[in-house]
């Protein structure tokens, strides 16, 4: 009987601890102003990269260093990122301290036309590489806009908070192409993001907790 009570008390304690961790991560929070913020940016392929780089191009130099994460087979996004950063350096005068940037690659979580069932396994495989990367970087902010690669990255960022390592702010910006329905990544991450931004009023009506700022890319 005593052993049962001990097990029950232990289980209850673990449940309470888990809820405390989840409240810390998902509950109300306050952002403390800082001189710089370590930024992790998830870039997809094609239009996703174009949109996210437009957002990055409008950020101040306070968002530094910048860590870009792309799929390991995405050479086009790598070229666009290098071009943006080099252009930013060329436009700054010699006295300006421009942000440092790093490029990281992880396995793609879902290929084009890949079945939903098999994508579950590839996403877990991508997660195997994502968590150590996010743990090493320990970003202050994750910025993403819908590619499948952002799911394992954002889940990894959430885990840092649950494990008590660091509270990471997750900002998800739904693609401008999404007018009436969310992308699959959006449907998943709207529950995990600190700020879920949509660019059409129709989506704001469907998802009242989202943030609508008009077209931002």
Curated annotation (Swiss-Prot):
Gene3D superfamilies: Glycogen Phosphorylase B. It comes from the Eukaryota. It holds the Pfam family Alg14. Residues 1-3 are lumenal. Residues 27-217 are cytoplasmic. It is found in: Endoplasmic reticulum membrane. It is a single-pass membrane protein. Its main location: endoplasmic reticulum. The chain crosses the membrane at residues 4-26. GO terms for biological process: dolichol-linked oligosaccharide biosynthetic process; protein N-linked glycosylation. One of its GO terms (molecular function) is protein-membrane adaptor activity. Disulfide bonds: none annotated. The keyword Phosphoprotein does not apply. The keyword Zinc-finger does not apply. One of its GO terms (cellular component) is cytoplasmic side of endoplasmic reticulum membrane. Keywords: Endoplasmic reticulum, Membrane, Transmembrane, Transmembrane helix. Belongs to the ALG14 family. Forms with ALG13 the active heterodimeric UDP-N-acetylglucosamine transferase complex. Part of the UDP-N-acetylglucosamine transferase complex that operates in the biosynthetic pathway of dolichol-linked oligosaccharides, the glycan precursors employed in protein asparagine (N)-glycosylation. The assembly of dolichol-linked oligosaccharides begins on the cytosolic side of the endoplasmic reticulum membrane and finishes in its lumen. The sequential addition of sugars to dolichol pyrophosphate produces dolichol-linked oligosaccharides containing fourteen sugars, including two GlcNAcs, nine mannoses and three glucoses. This is UDP-N-acetylglucosamine transferase subunit ALG14. It comes from Mus musculus (Mouse). The lineage of its organism: Eukaryota, Metazoa, Chordata, Craniata, Vertebrata.
